[in-house]
Amino acid sequence: GTIQYQELQVYDGMVYLSNSVTDEEIRTIMNTMDEMGKMDRYMEMEMMKEPIAASADGKTEDVYLCVPEDKDMVDEFMTFRDRTSGEIYHLTDDGVILTEKMAKTLDVSRGDPIYIGVDGEEKEVTVTDICENYMEHYVYMTAELYEELYGEEPGYNSILFDLKNASDKEISD
């Protein structure tokens, strides 16, 4: 778990929101934390609480879909990299980043198509990169690609955040 949380998912915390929370309520929560002087930065993200189906060549597996609000800012919270070469990847509107074990399970490589199903709608996407990961299976896509595929904005249901000067003790308390 050390590599996962110190090198790959490098945010201090995540807040899951109920479906009924409004954008205004989210801003109020974030402004309050900001005013308390605790918040360094934050970003909203759609993170499916239930896995969705990802399939390729007749193989289907469960995967969690993650759609960060800001494809440029996501690099401050997560590192997408090749496990062996260390090459860093960035989310683009051209396709998805798939975690390594899922890519192996589906037997797909960079440039291959996969199908992902959201709310019963199966869409084809291209695997642009395959990233190192040790916990669960994820597929990452930009908000712009999500909108293009599904005709609506992602329903942001979580907030990733970093605290100012957070020590390991403060984070665990």
List each model region and its residues.
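Short, charged/polar "capping" segments at the starts of alpha-helices
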Residues: 20-27, 167-172
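Short beta-strand boundary microenvironments
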Residues: 5-13, 22-113, 122-126, 130, ...
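Short, strongly hydrophobic transmembrane alpha-helices
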Residues: 1-2
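Small-residue transmembrane helix packing/gating motifs
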Residues: 7-9, 90, 130-172
